[in-house]
Amino acid sequence: MKLPKEGDFITIQSYKHDGEIHRTWRDTMVLKTTENAIIGVNNHTLVTENDGRRWVTREPAIVYFHKKYWFNIIAMIRENGVSYYCNLASPYVLDNEALKYIDYDLDVKVFADGEKRLLDVDEYERHRKAMKYSDDIDFILKENVKILVDWINNQRGPFSPAYVNIWYKRYLELRSR
């Protein structure tokens, strides 16, 4: 598939390990595409849950997906600062339909004040048994939690204040065209 260009809109689909669709985001605007990463923005984006429920994102969020790391990052721009929601997930694949990845339940939330929390550990353990995650996947995910925490602690990539400012500014420029 041809890579999306700056200003294009794509669909994002999250799946579970068993192949069931988990969640879909419609019309994520692409801000940058490289060989290994896609940066986009969601702002009042329609989200559809696997049970059919729908909702719209409340605030602008810069999204970061990578082909080598087992996580994706959502930087939510709020009045009280930027907070992050990080999904432990497979590297993304892109086809003619959507950007797709497998959500592996574990999440890291970073609050605007810098507090970090590992979320959904019980759900991860339950799904790991029920969906038979391999020992290799379990190891990879736990190693990627360490990488993610290192990025957070060192303000690397999406966790750099300059990163969010640059990409949000670019979004505003593209939106006003």
Curated annotation (Swiss-Prot):
MF annotations from Gene Ontology: magnesium ion binding; nucleoside diphosphate phosphatase activity; ribonucleoside triphosphate phosphatase activity
A Pfam family reported for this protein in Swiss-Prot or TrEMBL: DUF402
Cofactor(s) demanded: Mg(2+)
Binding-site residues for Mg(2+) 2, renumbered to this chain: 105, 107, 120, 123
Keyword Magnesium: yes
InterPro entries named in the record: DUF402, FomD-like_sf, Ntdp-like, SA1684
Reaction catalysed by this enzyme: a ribonucleoside 5'-triphosphate + H2O = a ribonucleoside 5'-diphosphate + phosphate + H(+); a ribonucleoside 5'-diphosphate + H2O = a ribonucleoside 5'-phosphate + phosphate + H(+)
Upper lineage: Bacteria, Bacillati, Bacillota, Bacilli, Lactobacillales
Keywords on record: Hydrolase, Magnesium, Metal-binding
Biological source species: Streptococcus suis (strain 05ZYH33)
Active site (UniProt): 23
Name by which UniProt lists this protein: Nucleoside triphosphate/diphosphate phosphatase
SUPFAM superfamilies from the UniProt entry: FomD-like
Annotated EC: 3.6.1.15, 3.6.1.6
Binding annotation for Mg(2+) 1: 87, 103, 107
Family assignment from sequence similarity: Belongs to the Ntdp family.
Biological role: Has nucleoside phosphatase activity towards nucleoside triphosphates and nucleoside diphosphates.
Keyword Hydrolase: yes
Disulfide bonds: none
